[in-house]
Amino acid sequence: MASFGMNWNQKSPVFWDWENPAPFGPNTMENPKSIPHPEPRGVVVAAANHGSTNSSGGTFTSSSELANGSSKSSLSASFDSSSKLGNSLEFRFASVKGHGKNMCKDGEAGRVEDSGTSPAVAVSHGEPVIGLKLGKRTYFENVCGGQNVKSSSAASGVTCPSTVVKKMKVSQQSTQSSYCQVEGCKVDLSSAREYHRKHKVCEAHSKAPKVIVSGLERRFCQQCSRFHGLAEFDQKKKSCRRRLSDHNARRRKPQQEAISFGSSRLATMFYDARQQTDIYFGQSPFGQVRSNAISSCDNLGGFKFTEAKLPWMKPMKTIGLEDLNFSTLQMPGNVVSHTVHHHDFDGLIPFKGNTPKVLNQGVDPACAVVSSNSNGAPDLRRALSLLSSDSWGPADVQAGSQVHPGGVMPPLAVAAATVTAPTNPVSVMHALHPSTGGGGFWQDGDDPPPLDHASQAQAFMHPGNGSSSGYGHLH
């Protein structure tokens, strides 16, 4: 057994202040009054076996006495090692008693007494005393081996003045009673609702039409939660005029409707707009007249007669009779014809009035022939389709824009006119044989002449400044 002693006052410091890391060293022991004496929060004792493994054992005792003379500590330990148990280290701590006066930050004196006993703790060689597991205190966790560590400590801490001040404020606020701010009202609001306590007004005066606050006649606004002058309120209103106007403006604000392009409402809107401006081919007001097939004249420069289809929402231009100069032939009645598409050909355009005109620009011949019975039923015998197998003679187109008998142009499709009002009569024009008189046209009520030969059609040149839309309108 070997014994040795050491003086802690001459060695490296052991006690540290965790908030002010100023150690107790030899310099601090000389002038203990120059620095405050903090309370030691904890002491960490670490022992490492740096000696020879052949040492049978050892004990050491240490004692320290501070300059203030009020603290004593004693520590005894014995080192035992044997070859049977292996290289192990055993600590035996005796009871440590210390009495001292410690000063806190604010100068208030406190006295701490610690007494504790702990059983022997065996630490195997090679395992660290302090572990690296985060969030756990692993000083002797892995080496206790199921032993119960019992420690008893009693400490009386000193509370800081800041905490005391906060507690005093909370207690004052809880004990302080609030009253209504209306003059003459002494209603205690401690048991009232939080809303009334916050705004310092009782429930009766919050709904009163007129109260006196600070010598002025006021009224409590329900939305502003404060008192306003009586001039800011309307009669029998609990809120001021400004708040009510803002509230009503938000409620009456028109909301913009989002138009869905796939909705039936939008389709109906476009359908109504098209019905007013567009022309429907293939049906009459009575549902009897139907347009027949359309033929083309390949020998006349590639004419192709198709039905006019107006694009949606496209503005149309209507030209009166007084704005244009027309040729000699005029078709009486409201006539709707097919549109002839050929390069710069403007088409057949009826205009406003009772005598719409058929215009042709840039093309000498016109191939529009209208055929129908007097009762409005289509004449299928006289209307030929594109798949017609009838043979026709060679084309002979003269400069006078007339098609002679034996020409190549067959009778073309039927164009039915639809009018805006169902009471107006429907006038259907028919092309006549060259032998018939009367300008080559006949009206409803007359029997249609037989179309044994090719129909005669006369085209008119456009004056040059006409409309270029090529669509028909009825007014």
From Swiss-Prot:
Zn finger (SBP-type) location: 177-254
Predominant location: nucleus
Chain positions of motif Bipartite nuclear localization signal: 237-253
Polar residues bias spans: 465-475
GO cellular component entries: nucleus
Region Disordered, annotated ranges: 49-73, 437-475
Compartment annotation: Nucleus
Residues that hold Zn(2+) 1 according to the record: C180, C185, C202, H205
Induction field: Negatively regulated by microRNAs miR156b and miR156h.
Pfam families: SBP
Biased segments, Low complexity type: 51-73
Binding site for Zn(2+) 2: C221, C224, H228, C240
GO molecular function: DNA binding; zinc ion binding
Free-text tissue specificity from the UniProt record: Expressed in young panicles.
UniProt keyword terms in alphabetical order: DNA-binding, Metal-binding, Nucleus, Transcription, Transcription regulation, Zinc, Zinc-finger
SUPFAM superfamilies: SBT domain (SSF103612)
Free-text domain note: The SBP-type zinc finger is required for the binding to DNA.
Role description: Trans-acting factor that binds specifically to the consensus nucleotide sequence 5'-TNCGTACAA-3'. May be involved in panicle development.
Protein name: Squamosa promoter-binding-like protein 12
Species for this entry: Oryza sativa subsp. japonica
